[in-house]
């Protein structure tokens, strides 16, 4: 078992992208709500898919769809959270304007200390650290290649406060090694309670899942999810 585990952080996967999911996540007493933030005009909005220019048509790797419902923006998410849960951002935009807007909003709403920000564009995380050293930044690691690259950065002297890593990449040795460096490990795409419990025993700090019943069970707030 991890030697110095703090409280477990339960994170509702992409729940900030949908008003209905956001309400459900808060009703489930999760610790944090994940939101995929993109710059859309003058707003930071929460969605995973991209948008075709000038059209309300959105696409991802496997689909395209029209969207009629107004998008959830960052301010609306923070209004809903209102201290009931923290925000876990997956930053999707690469522009400096998006970063500046994000940081300005977090400062204005006085939630810098409680917010975690992850992303696959690691240079953006470095820039955010330069602007606001108190932010909790998590390097997103989704495959073996990015894990190898991250470990080379550590060997080269780079510091990191956290990682958001695909659960399949985590083993006991890796969890212990990162924990020894003071790196907060959040495992995502966790969809089995037994796996979540194993990760926790290894010292993983956070579990990201779209299964709210699983997250409730991890905190002892409900029965195991039905399978």
Segments the model singles out, each with a brief description of its role:
Residues 1-227:
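Phosphate-group recognition and catalysis centered on beta-loop-alpha active-site segments
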């Amino acid at each position: 078992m991890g030697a110095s585990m703090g409280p477990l952080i339960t994170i509702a996967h992409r729940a900030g992208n949908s008003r209905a999911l956001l309400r459900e996540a808060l009703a489930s007493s999760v610790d944090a709500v994940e939101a995929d933030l993109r710059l859309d005009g003058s707003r930071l909005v929460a969605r995973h898919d991209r948008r075709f220019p000038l059209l309300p048509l959105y696409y991802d790797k496997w689909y395209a769809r029209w969207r009629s419902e107004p998008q959830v923006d960052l301010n609306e998410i923070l209004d809903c959270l209102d201290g009931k849960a923290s925000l876990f951002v997956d930053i999707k935009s690469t522009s400096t304007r998006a970063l500046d807007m994000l940081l300005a909003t977090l400062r204005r709403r006085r939630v810098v200390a409680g917010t975690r920000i992850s992303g696959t564009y690691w240079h953006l995380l470095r820039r955010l650290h330069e602007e606001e050293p108190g932010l909790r930044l998590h390097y997103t690691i989704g495959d073996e290649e990015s894990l190898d690259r991250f470990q080379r950065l550590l060997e080269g002297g780079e510091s990191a406060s956290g990682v958001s890593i695909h659960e399949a990449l985590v083993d006991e040795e890796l969890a212990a090694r990162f924990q020894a460096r003071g790196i907060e490990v959040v495992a995502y795409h966790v969809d089995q309670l037994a796996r979540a419990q194993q990760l926790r025993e290894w010292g993983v700090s956070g579990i990201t899942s779209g299964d709210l019943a699983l997250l409730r069970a991890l905190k002892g707030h409900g029965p195991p999810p039905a399978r």
